[in-house]
């Protein structure tokens, strides 16, 4: 005779945790830092956005693909323009206070430092590519983009300085 089948029982223990639980939120509503745009770093970010937009639109409105060097200038200008808009939104909405795990002063220093270095190289490439094209109908747009690229470089240099000061004060504490 066959033995009757016994009912098996298992104990299952589950634990649930959410990655979002690790983030401390101070409030559920969005904050807006109205004073940020009145600070020098805030004004520099706005200048970077406006001048960076001028750099890449002045080049994009021409036949820039005929001069390969402008591809580098376009990449740097558009890449850092998008990231700068992203950082402006983070600073205005005070998102950095909701995500304390991110070392924002270090991120800001690396971002502004890399933007300064790459924009400087792009501005030099832009200026050196304009000169041989003096007879081109695109000359004025390219010359203006070169001028604005150097202005954006100065803005990123200023923000790199302020980021360094903020980073240094955080590491000393």
Swiss-Prot record:
Key word Transmembrane present: yes
InterPro entries linked to this entry: MAL, Marvel, MARVEL-CKLF_proteins
Topology term for the membrane: Multi-pass membrane protein
Subcellular localization(s) per the UniProt record: Membrane
Domain MARVEL: 36-168
Gene Ontology CC annotation, any one: extracellular space
Alphabetical UniProt keywords: Chemotaxis, Cytokine, Membrane, Transmembrane, Transmembrane helix
GO molecular-function terms, A-Z: cytokine activity; structural constituent of myelin sheath
Pfam name, any one: MARVEL
Chain ranges passing through the membrane: 40-60, 70-90, 105-125, 147-167
GO BP field: chemotaxis; myelination
Major location (coarse): membrane
Claim: Transmembrane is one of the keywords in the record: yes
UniProt xrefs under PANTHER family: CKLF-LIKE MARVEL TRANSMEMBRANE DOMAIN-CONTAINING PROTEIN 8, MARVEL-CONTAINING POTENTIAL LIPID RAFT-ASSOCIATED PROTEIN
Protein family according to the UniProt entry: Belongs to the chemokine-like factor family.
Name of this protein: CKLF-like MARVEL transmembrane domain-containing protein 8
Organism per entry: Bos taurus (Bovine)
């Amino acid at each position: 005779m066959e033995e009757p089948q016994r009912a098996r029982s298992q104990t299952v223990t589950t634990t649930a945790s959410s990655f979002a639980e690790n983030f401390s939120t101070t409030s559920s509503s969005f904050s807006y830092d109205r004073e940020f745009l009145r600070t020098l770093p805030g004004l520099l970010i706005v200048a970077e956005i406006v001048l960076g937009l001028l750099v890449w639109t002045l080049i994009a409105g021409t036949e820039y693909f005929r001069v390969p060097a402008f591809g580098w200038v376009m990449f740097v200008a558009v890449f850092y323009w998008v990231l700068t808009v992203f950082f402006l939104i983070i600073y205005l909405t005070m998102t950095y206070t909701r995500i304390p795990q991110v070392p924002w002063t270090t991120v800001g220093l690396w971002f502004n430092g890399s933007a300064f270095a790459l924009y400087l190289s792009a501005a030099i490439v832009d200026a050196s590519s304009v000169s041989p094209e003096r007879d081109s109908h695109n000359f004025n747009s390219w010359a203006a983009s070169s001028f604005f690229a150097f202005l954006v470089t100065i803005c990123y240099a200023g923000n790199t300085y302020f980021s360094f000061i903020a980073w240094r004060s955080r590491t000393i504490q």
